[in-house]
Amino acid sequence: MKKWQFVGTTALGATLLLGACGGGNGGSGNSDLKGEAKGDGSSTVAPIVEKLNEKWAQDHSDAKISAGQAGTGAGFQKFIAGDIDFADASRPIKDEEKQKLQDKNIKYKEFKIAQDGVTVAVNKENDFVDELDKQQLKAIYSGKAKTWKDVNSKWPDKKINAVSPNSSHGTYDFFENEVMNKEDIKAEKNADTNAIVSSVTKNKEGIGYFGYNFYVQNKDKLKEVKIKDENCKATEPTKKTIQDNSYALSRPLFIYVNEKALKDNKVMSEFIKFVLEDKGKAAEEAGYVAAPEKTYKSQLDDLKAFIDKNQKSDDKKSDDKKSEDKK
């Protein structure tokens, strides 16, 4: 697992440098805010959090956001254990994860921070795979189609080299739900998305899937595949098709926050406000797609209402205590 201490450009060395230099414009804005909020989770969401922290650190040199990228599933495990304040996720929380949180009396808030399109790509030299439907993808990743000819009789009789994220990734869960229909993924699995990209670029018969941002970063070495299903015509992932959901493998990206952390940790609540007020700009900079503006506005309104409600509750408790002390 790669762990980043995000305060600016993410790596620990950069964190120390930013602290020594005052975090760029540190000292302005809400510079009296001090403390830390801890998170972990999706490697897909991680680049967005990185971009957000580059902006956050400019005005909050003493308010640190530390986040790992252990994968969505592993992030939720830590969230359930109470080890972190927030979990980054590239899929919605599962029912069994909700139940475990409920069993521990942990309440949470879900925030949609961006949109993504799981991109299917083949080797740049592949000159025959331009589009696939979900049934063909399922045949490839279930192992039933062993050669390209098994997928389409007009294609070469060459063995397919299919690569997938491993089960710790939300991208794996999303693909399993959207494409596999409960069948097991029988392909080479890797925890490192960059290794999946590398495998496809090095193997002429390679095929892999990953977040849109990983394709954007490597599009000179990969060939994207149009995807279709019964609801969507063959479409490639673009900012437009991902945002309007006309791309068949579009999905939202999330940050889940412990309600107690929102109430008690000013760094956590201010950071989430900052995320929503950014309105997806950091997501766009990281190669993903902003959600519709109304999504950020409605969530920000809900967050402010939640914070105000709890502040009033705290004030009332304080007043009640003072009254009790006077008796």
From Swiss-Prot:
It comes from the Bacteria. Residues 307-327 are annotated as: Disordered. A lipid is attached at residue 21 (N-palmitoyl cysteine). It is a lipid-anchor. PROSITE patterns: PROKAR_LIPOPROTEIN. One of its GO terms (molecular function) is phosphate ion binding. GO terms for cellular component: plasma membrane. It holds the Pfam family PBP_like_2. The keyword Signal applies. It is found in: Cell membrane. PANTHER family: PERIPLASMIC PHOSPHATE BINDING COMPONENT OF PHOSPHATE ABC TRANSPORTER (PTHR30570), PHOSPHATE-BINDING PROTEIN PSTS (PTHR30570:SF1). Part of the ABC transporter complex PstSACB involved in phosphate import. Belongs to the PstS family. This is Phosphate-binding protein PstS. It comes from Staphylococcus aureus (strain bovine RF122 / ET3-1). The lineage of its organism: Bacteria, Bacillati, Bacillota, Bacilli, Bacillales.
